[in-house]
Curated annotation (Swiss-Prot):
Keywords linked to the UniProt accession: Methyltransferase, S-adenosyl-L-methionine, Transferase
Protein's job: Exhibits S-adenosyl-L-methionine-dependent methyltransferase activity.
GO BP term, example: methylation
GO molecular function: methyltransferase activity
SUPFAM superfamilies on file: S-adenosyl-L-methionine-dependent methyltransferases (SSF53335)
Family: Belongs to the UPF0677 family.
Name recorded for this polypeptide: Putative S-adenosyl-L-methionine-dependent methyltransferase MUL_0818
Entry keyword S-adenosyl-L-methionine: yes
EC number: 2.1.1.-
Source lineage: Bacteria, Bacillati, Actinomycetota, Actinomycetes, Mycobacteriales
EC class: transferase
Amino acid sequence: MTSTGSTRYDGDSWDLASSVGVTATMVAAARAMATRAENPLINDPYAEPLVRAVGVDLLTRLATGEFNVADLDDDPQRPLGPIGDVADNMAVRTRFFDDFFLAATRAGLEQVVILASGRDARAYRLPWPPQTVVYEIDLPQVIDFKSRTLADLGAAPTADRRVVAVDLREDWPAALRAAGFDPNQPTAWSAEGLLGYLPPEAQDRLLDTVTELSAPGSRLAAECLSGVDPAEEEQIKERMQEVSARWRAHGFDVDMVGLVYFGDRNEAVPYLSDRGWLLTSTPLPELRAANGLAPAAVDDDGPSVDMLYVSGTLYTTPRPDPAP
């Protein structure tokens, strides 16, 4: 794959209801749906009010249960199949990262860094051990919106929450250190729903920087695609365009193809393994099964792409040679 297929560009910007910003609101809506399930795997009481505060009508109706996501699959000639599984898939994804953070902090790690935290409310809803410091990195307007909205709800963080209001395309390590981050202490990092929204070279830079900032014993959890066949790029785009068309038909204008970066990129797992991380990868179907969920609907017309949930520990920390 050599083309990007993206409408993104260097230095582009967005708000909470458009472009990449709206994807975090979509994720929060899915968490709200998962929280309302009959036997919920997660409990995120802040997802629905955060979606309401953004004000995208269809996403608000999804979050409150007024609209069923399965109703998007309303063309019998081109069924989308897996779209009805979005709440369950979000539940297992959220549970994966929740469990990762709790295991890491209960093992003694006191620093947590959430990259591109979006509408993530873990600093408010997880039972963090004492002394845990949670650093949230995202754009200033994203951080400010979430802080104000949750304060208006009377919510209080359950850890020492420190906001790092900076674009990941800027010097975020300096901003992180300025907030009190200590690279000599082990850290629990998350890259949830992030890597696909980065250009290939930016993904490498991010993973390199995380490694450089990580003391031995640090832990990392990430969501990433694997097994993307270059021959299937156009098929992937067509399927994403069909999903976008269904959203638009119900009043929500979003271009999923334009938000992500296609093209050749290093797969995150071998890339990180080469840099000292010992990782375990769990495909989404296995994660569903481990959480007692039935297999997801099969998209017979869709591409064969694996969504992996990856976690592991840094045992050796490559450091650049000092300048002469």
